[in-house]
Design a protein with these regions (language model features):
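Active-site-proximal loop/helix segment associated with metal-binding centers of metalloenzymes
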Residues: 121-200
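Residue-level detector of flexible, active-site-proximal loop/helix-junction positions
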Residues: 9, 109, 125, 241, ...
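N-terminal short leaders/motifs
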Residues: 47-73, 171, 180-212
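Arg/Gly-rich low-complexity intrinsically disordered repeat tracts
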Residues: 251-261
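Extreme N-terminal starter segment of soluble prokaryotic enzymes
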Residues: 1-3
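Core catalytic region of metal-dependent phosphoesterases/phosphodiesterases
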Residues: 5, 10-111
């Protein structure tokens, strides 16, 4: 069995009981480990993650989760970690500590004879999307694109890693907390097949001849299972922050499931 999950936002200051939340995710992974050959973590597993040049005591809060990843990879389960827009800044320590494989960009894979497109989902929009939006929306999208470029800039990443972790983490965790609180105050539900960015992106890929049987994303914190055509399908995984939804794939079927809390 192959599993896909995303958006746990471990360590979020917007979570009332972060240790209990972490334990739920651990229970979820251990349940999957009973029959898993691979687990794909599709981004934003951490609410904020950065590997500095200095020792960072804040990583100790994740020790139970990191130990679980190590135990699973030691058993021969392949665990793939896709960076999201909250946990971009991993530079080798996480992979070395746990045995996972880190992916920094979308991947196109063939699994069980099916062609898959896997990504967190941030920054994926159709080529003409910006021009079609009202000016107010264009402004917000441009701000997001600018911020994403800043976060992915190698020079700025290097400089940020030079900061003392206590100072940098305060900024990072507060920024991430504000993002979560905004989502709670003003949730963004499914926009519809003709407006949802990831749906439009997947449709454009199909139109361009870049066919995939499944497109699997996180990022949006919505649960979606939609047929794009007779032989192409998109799934948005929900999240492991509030919903604890995931997808599982066997030889015959891919479906979204709920973890029983």
């Amino acid at each position: 069995m192959i599993y896909f999950l995303s958006d746990a936002h471990l360590g979020s200051r917007a979570i009332d009981n972060p240790l209990a939340h972490q334990q739920t995710l651990i229970d979820m992974l251990q349940s999957m480990a009973k029959d898993a050959t691979a687990i794909y973590l599709l981004g934003d597993i951490f609410d904020f993650w950065c590997e500095y040049f200095w020792r960072d005591k804040s990583k100790e809060q994740y020790r139970p989760f990191l130990q679980t990843l190590k135990e699973l990879t030691d058993k021969g389960i392949d665990i793939h970690f896709f960076i999201g827009n909250h946990d971009i800044w991993t530079f080798g320590w996480l992979a070395k500590e746990t045995g996972i494989t880190v992916h920094r960009r979308p991947e196109e894979l063939t699994i069980n004879g099916k062609r898959l497109f896997l990504a967190h989902g941030d920054g994926l929009v159709p080529s003409n999307y910006l021009q079609q939006m009202p000016k107010a929306i264009q402004k917000k999208i441009k701000q997001f694109i600018f911020l994403r470029r800043v976060f992915h800039n190698p020079i700025l990443q290097f400089l940020f890693r030079l900061l003392l972790p206590a100072w940098a983490n305060e900024f990072g965790y507060e920024w991430a907390k504000n993002s979560r609180l905004k989502e709670l105050a003003r949730p963004c539900p499914y926009k519809g097949e003709d407006k949802e960015e990831l749906v439009l992106f997947a449709k454009e890929q199909e139109q361009l001849g870049n066919h995939h049987d499944y497109y699997i994303f996180g990022h949006r914190h919505i649960e979606l299972d939609l047929m794009l055509s007779r032989d192409s399908r998109i799934m948005i995984l929900g999240d492991c922050w509030q919903q604890f939804t995931y997808a599982q794939m066997d030889n015959y079927e891919l479906r979204i499931m709920n973890f029983e809390l």
